[in-house]
Amino acid sequence: MTIQKNWQELIRPNKLQVSPGSDATRFATLVAEPLERGFGQTLGNALRRVLLSSLQGAAVQSVQIDGVLHEFSSIAGVREDVTDIVLNIKDISLKMQGEGPKRMVVKKQGPGVVTAGDIQTVGDIVVLNPDLQICTLDEGAEIRMEFTVNTGKGYVAAERNRPEDAPIGLIPVDSLYSPVRKVSYKVENTREGQILDYDKLTMTVETNGALTPDDAVAFAARILQDQLNVFVNFEEPRKEVTQEIIPDLAFNPAFLKKVDELELSVRSANCLKNDNIVYIGDLVQKSEAEMLRTPNFGRKSLNEIKEVLAQMGLHLGMEVPGWPPENIDELAKRFEDHY
């Protein structure tokens, strides 16, 4: 059906490349390539908006401090006033498995610093930034605070967290539910075969640790997928199952596999891409000397490639009769499940 060509023949990435940062639970860079021209901006902007606004998380909704009637008070022996304490409470990062609202309490005597790690939580609430300072107590000072924790999405201002029947002394807190703290993306040109006119989308994601960055992106993509389904007003025709005739090849079908599927280091992969080596068939015909003449390609990259090829029963310097075939892209798709 011709209409199917609208989406079936568009180029799309084989997989998402995830490079964890110093803390894999909080930082990562994700790369998707190749994408059709313009899709980098389209997908990057949409994912960024959903990541920052629509993912579920947990946060403090309100706090009650013993002896305090409102947020414009001060507490004897506590160096910070209540307004500053509330601002610090807003920065507490939480992970909660079940539904809210739930309570957690902190009680401490001075002298010393009250941190988020001092909070007594119930079983399914985890404080993700225990070193966060909430307030400082002088000698003889004491403080007790009770927090209300709930789940939600995005940002909710303190005014919306004040219930109509709020008791005296309940102080609402701005709630930042989103587990995603920062998202940035950039779009660059990339190559697919001989064509340079494709997009490469690179996203840098930072979370509070409640979700890993790649899980956060996965949930954001699922939200977009679900929202876009309403615009699809047709049923996809079922594919007729036919017995495909696999042609005989003069070479190993594994040569039709692309080198970017070999999970090489970034340096080695970039060297191959810059030398226009797309398929394994292109690679195995090269000699070691030819590879070492490739710009920025050193002995370490050579050994890495030799090891990967050896695991496939291949090596550099092979003779490949009939390579490259005229219909190489078509053959690569047909043999995708056979090598």
Swiss-Prot record:
GO terms for molecular function: DNA binding; DNA-directed RNA polymerase activity; protein dimerization activity. Residues 1-235 are annotated as: Alpha N-terminal domain (alpha-NTD). One of its GO terms (cellular component) is cytoplasm. The keyword Transmembrane does not apply. It catalyses: RNA(n) + a ribonucleoside 5'-triphosphate = RNA(n+1) + diphosphate. Gene3D superfamilies: 5' to 3' exonuclease, C-terminal subdomain, DNA-directed RNA polymerase, insert domain, RNA polymerase, RBP11-like subunit. One of its GO terms (biological process) is DNA-templated transcription. Residues 251-339 are annotated as: Alpha C-terminal domain (alpha-CTD). InterPro entries: DNA-dir_RNA_pol_insert (IPR011262), DNA-dir_RNA_pol_RpoA/D/Rpb3 (IPR011263), DNA-dir_RpoA (IPR011773), RBP11-like (IPR036603), RNAP_asu_C (IPR011260), RNApol_insert_sf (IPR036643). Its EC number is 2.7.7.6. The keyword Zinc does not apply. Keywords: DNA-directed RNA polymerase, Nucleotidyltransferase, Transcription, Transferase. It comes from the Bacteria. The N-terminal domain is essential for RNAP assembly and basal transcription, whereas the C-terminal domain is involved in interaction with transcriptional regulators and with upstream promoter elements. Homodimer. The RNAP catalytic core consists of 2 alpha, 1 beta, 1 beta' and 1 omega subunit. When a sigma factor is associated with the core the holoenzyme is formed, which can initiate transcription. Belongs to the RNA polymerase alpha chain family. DNA-dependent RNA polymerase catalyzes the transcription of DNA into RNA using the four ribonucleoside triphosphates as substrates. This is DNA-directed RNA polymerase subunit alpha. It comes from Rhodopseudomonas palustris (strain BisB5).
